[in-house]
């Protein structure tokens, strides 16, 4: 069948050949075939599209822009789609909106309906613009690239901040459930309750909680609040020592993309009587179009932590260490480094001159990682499935 496919590609015209090769994922072959076509016919929309789209797929972003813009100008809807995505990845909301408008015009002209992807990217552009208006000033003092399977082990929390537990801890402590379907669990210092995430029959994750009784046994578990998922999945709970403020991650309708970190507060009721308020997206630079999760703030050490796969390192996530603020202060909207601060292209942009952050880390970190108390060599590996 490969010989038949190759023969059919060879007998087709250059654009049909490019389309077939592109659909097969052979982007280098598309680039090789389309370069001379674009040179001969620089205004050919389809040739420019396949050249630009293949360069984009190969990660040659700068070179992809010109042919994609030419194709967009010729009314190729998919060229405008890719340019909109590229603008979102650069945190350029206004440029993204421009390409979304061109995308919409091309779809209208060709009498094609707007897809779910169109609606999703349009929402993301609006949300990105709103988030860029309120990027928080924080000091990121360190970043650590670690294996995604055990990322939580590098959170050096003091005992007052509670403990992050490996996924099998929930079943080992008697709360039931399949360890393979559990997220990192959280237990406060007083060991009064356990919070975790588990998948339901639809494959979506909900946050669960259970009280720990005086004899150390686990009371029956309950879903904290189905609304915390916001139509997606909710995972990675962390409860502040006030017993009210809950950080977690969801990938629902108010996420910029993938998992975003959210904050909610709960009432002082007991067990199933607790009510959770509308979750608030904590914004940038914590969140990104990628997966951002497991916010933990240690008031005793004055340090905070969160994890992200925004740097797209295979098998790894980046854990950022930062100094939490008592009061939120946002970066000035006209700051020329706004987008770079928002996406943390360099943590140095968040730091103050003359501060010895290495010394701050040395003096502020607890002497041990409390999460390590509950871990053992027999603990199963935690596969971070962000789907």
Enumerate the predicted regions with their spans:
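Alpha-helical segment of the N-proximal tetratricopeptide repeat
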Residues: 13-41
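Structural motif corresponding to the intra-repeat A-B loop/turn of tetratricopeptide repeats
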Residues: 24, 58, 90-91
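Short coil turns that delineate tetratricopeptide repeat
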Residues: 42, 74-76, 108
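Start-of-helix register in tetratricopeptide repeats
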Residues: 46, 78-80
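Short, conserved micro-motifs composed of acidic
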Residues: 82, 89, 93-95, 106-387
């Amino acid at each position: 069948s490969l010989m038949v496919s190759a023969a059919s590609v060879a007998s087709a015209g250059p654009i049909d050949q490019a389309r077939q090769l592109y659909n097969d994922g052979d982007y280098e072959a598309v680039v090789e075939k389309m370069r001379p076509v674009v040179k001969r016919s620089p205004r050919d929309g389809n040739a420019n599209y396949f050249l630009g789209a293949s360069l984009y797929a190969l990660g040659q972003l700068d070179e992809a822009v010109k042919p994609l813009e030419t194709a967009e100008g010729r009314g190729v809807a998919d060229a405008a789609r890719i340019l909109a995505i590229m603008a979102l990845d650069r945190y350029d909301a206004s440029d993204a909106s421009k390409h979304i408008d061109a995308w919409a015009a091309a779809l209208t002209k060709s009498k094609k309906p707007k897809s779910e992807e169109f609606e999703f990217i349009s929402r993301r552009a609006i949300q990105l613009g709103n988030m860029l208006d309120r990027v928080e000033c924080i000091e990121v003092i360190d970043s650590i690239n670690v294996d995604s399977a055990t990322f939580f082990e590098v959170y050096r929390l003091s005992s007052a901040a509670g403990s992050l537990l490996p996924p099998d801890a929930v079943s080992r402590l008697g709360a039931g459930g399949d360890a393979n379907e559990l997220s990192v669990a959280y237990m406060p210092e007083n060991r009064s309750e356990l919070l975790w995430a588990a998948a339901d029959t639809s494959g979506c994750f909900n946050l669960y909680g259970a009280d720990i009784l005086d004899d150390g046994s686990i009371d029956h578990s309950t879903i904290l609040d189905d609304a915390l998922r916001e139509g997606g999945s909710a995972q990675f709970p962390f409860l502040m020592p006030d017993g009210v403020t809950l950080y977690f991650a969801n990938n629902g309708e108010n996420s910029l993309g993938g998992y975003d970190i959210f904050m909610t507060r709960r009432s002082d009721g007991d067990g199933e009587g607790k009510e959770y308020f509308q979750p608030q997206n904590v914004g940038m630079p914590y969140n990104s179009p990628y997966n951002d999760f497991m916010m933990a703030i240690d008031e005793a050490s004055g340090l905070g932590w969160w994890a992200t796969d925004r740097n797209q390192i295979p098998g790894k996530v980046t854990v950022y260490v930062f100094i939490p603020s008592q009061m939120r202060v946002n970066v000035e909207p006209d700051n020329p480094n706004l987008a770079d601060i928002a996406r943390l292209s360099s943590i140095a942009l968040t730091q103050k001159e003359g501060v010895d952050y290495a010394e701050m880390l040395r003096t502020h970190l607890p002497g041990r990682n409390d999460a390590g108390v509950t871990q053992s060599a027999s603990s199963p590996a935690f596969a971070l499935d962000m789907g």
